[in-house]
Amino acid sequence: VLKDGRPRLRAAPLDPPFRIVLVEPEIPQNTGNIARLAAATQSPLHLLGRLGFRIDERSVRRAGLDYWHLVTLEQHLDIAHFRHRHPNARLRLFSAVAQRSYLDADFRPGDALVFGKESVGLDPDLLARMPDDVFGIPTLGPVRSLNLANAVSIVLYEAL
C-alpha cells in the first residue's frame, strides 16, 4: 500500500522468490492457470513426480495463455530431489486435512509452497513427518477442499 492509502498495483520481485511446488498434478488446466500465476508473480514453478498429463498438452498451454515463456519451470523426480536441488527452501505444506490455517503460517521469501495432487493431496507420511509445516485453507460446510489453482492463488498472495 502506498503512503496515500492507494493499493500498489505492481510489486517488486522477491529475492529469493516463493516457489510454487506441485506434487503429481493431475489436471492440465489447473497447472496452466498456476503457470500464469507463477509468471504474474515471478515465482518459479516446480512440478514433482509423475504428471497426469504431458506438459506440452494443448490444454496446459492454453490455460497458461502466452505466458509460458515467462515461467521458470523445473521438473523433479520427487520431494527429495527438489530438496537436494533447493536445500535452503523451507517447505510449507498445504493440505485439506491440516489443523492450522494458512493465515497462521510464518511465510518467508524463499519458502517452497507445496501442494498435492488434486484427487488425494500430499502423502500422509510427508504430512506426519512435518506437522509444524502443514497448513490448510478453512472451508465451511460440506466442501472438502478448494480447486488447486484457487488454493495456490490464495496462499501465494497471502505469502506475498
What spans do the regions from the language model cover?
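Post-transcriptional modification and biogenesis factors for structured RNAs
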Residues: 1-160
